[in-house]
Amino acid sequence: MIAIRQKTAAAMGWLVPALFLLFPLAMGLSNVVLLLVLIGFAVTFNAGYLKRETWSWPAIWLMALFAVVLIGTLYTPAPWHWVSVNLSKYAKFVYAVVLMLLFARFPQWQKRALWAFVTAMLFVLVSTWLNVWLVLPWSATKTPGWGLSHHVFGDYITQNVMVSFLVVFALSSVQRPWRSRSNLFWLLVAVLGAVSITHLSSGRTGVLLLLAGLVSWMLVRWGGKKLLIGLPVLVLLVAGALASSSVMRERIALGWSEFAKRDLDVMSSVGHRAYNYRIVPKLIAESPVVGHGTGAYHTEICRFLDKPEWCDIFRWHSHNQFLFFGADHGLVGVLLYVALLVSLYLVARRSEHPQARVLLASLTSILLVDSMINTPLFSSRESHFFLFMMALLVAMNRQPLSR
């Protein structure tokens, strides 16, 4: 039995990095690898995983959130179809905790996993730029040309979420001496990544998330005083980049138009979100403490729509993770999610690792901003990214610097 555990642990040492390599590229295959990792965890499980020092506050809050989801199945009015959808989505909270425990026990896996993800995202970034001139068989978009929107896997929002983090990783990899070749490479990656969001994508969300990540990077890397100088420079750079991008100029103009007509056109991107922000609090007000139960949003929100035929359009999610938790799990769910976010910032603040603390703070800021305009923990690929990267970075930041 000991030999089986040792061989399983050795195999998992490469399966876990494979998971981080695959989820940006191939969700189906990454889920197969995830299943193998969970089986391997069960095979190698021992009392060491239960020791107090292996657990962190983010892990505790994730388990508490999943417990609330489980309890919510006892009083929800939603049919099993919607309950099962939410259980499958939020089971990733537990999977993330499993990864935290594995990374804590096997710290040598941490860099493998991080570099596996970076390798995948470099492939995505290069492919995005090649899309300007070539039709790539693996790319989601097939129309070459500058001034068009290009993305490789999934959708442009998900790609921009992960590229925003890649830009922060690239900037955090720049070290003294400043003129080294590696620094030039990472600066090039950061520029290409940022421009792919501002010039090669039709989405506005990516720009907001990029700003959130960069502000966190500046705050952690430079401190408050330098941030006062750097922030205006960052705003000017982003404004200049947006002004030079015909794609973003059109999207911003469209956004202003949608905002002005938000009460008249609830099917536009901005109008849809504004309508959700008006009606979801009404649903929450009916059961503000514990919510309506797991999956209840998908059916109960239809009672508040102006037109019944809109139900299938608005029932999938609320375009706001806080409202989503509030509808199903009330103030309890929202506070647990806030506690998770705060605990991530605290882990980063107390960390001795210069790069890892920047990455965790930026990841948390990107998640926070994304949660205000989307439901990232309900989205398949986004939840993989946020929860699994969260697990990795929490483990990295909790390791002694000597390791």
Where are these regions (language model features)?
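Transmembrane alpha-helices of multi-pass inner-membrane enzymes
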Residues: 36-42, 340, 360-372, 376-403
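Alpha-helical transmembrane segments of multi-pass inner-membrane proteins
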Residues: 19, 111-143, 152-222, 233, ...
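Long extracytoplasmic/lumenal interhelical loops at the membrane interface
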Residues: 264-278, 286, 290-329
